[in-house]
Amino acid sequence: MGSGKTTLARELARALRRPFFDSDQSIRERTGRNGREIAEAEGVEALHRLEADVLHEALGRSTPVVVAAAASVIDDPAVRGALEDTYCVWVTADPEILAERSARGDHRRAVGRTEHLEHRTPLFEQAADLVVDTGNLSESDSMERVLAAIRAP
């Protein structure tokens, strides 16, 4: 939440001429609710299961897509396995920056953000082919970094 992954993924999809898949949007279309509403009504675990389900749906498409997925999906061992066959970019920033940015969005309250980041960082580091820290990068610099890595031999 707040790393800029959706913006970066949308622009990357445009640059690569690939379909863009936003897990938050998919969840809204499927349920009529956003993540905060689902977490409040059904619990955080139900939301995380749904986030993993929509990522599996995106990864199962016949056409390669650029996906903006919730960070919680990395907790699912099946997702980590599926990511082994993809090019995975972990988009992150310092916790303070993430908190400031996500406070402006429609996400659920970020209780335990630091603990989640500490738990998920090694999982993302293992799964990611590229890590982009957007805290000190402009959107265009972040995009250039990803495109350069993808196009490198």
What are these model-predicted stretches?
Residues 85-123:
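A glycine- and Lys/Arg-enriched "phosphate-lid" helix/loop adjacent to the NTP-binding pocket
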Residues 4:
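Conserved glycine(s) of the Walker
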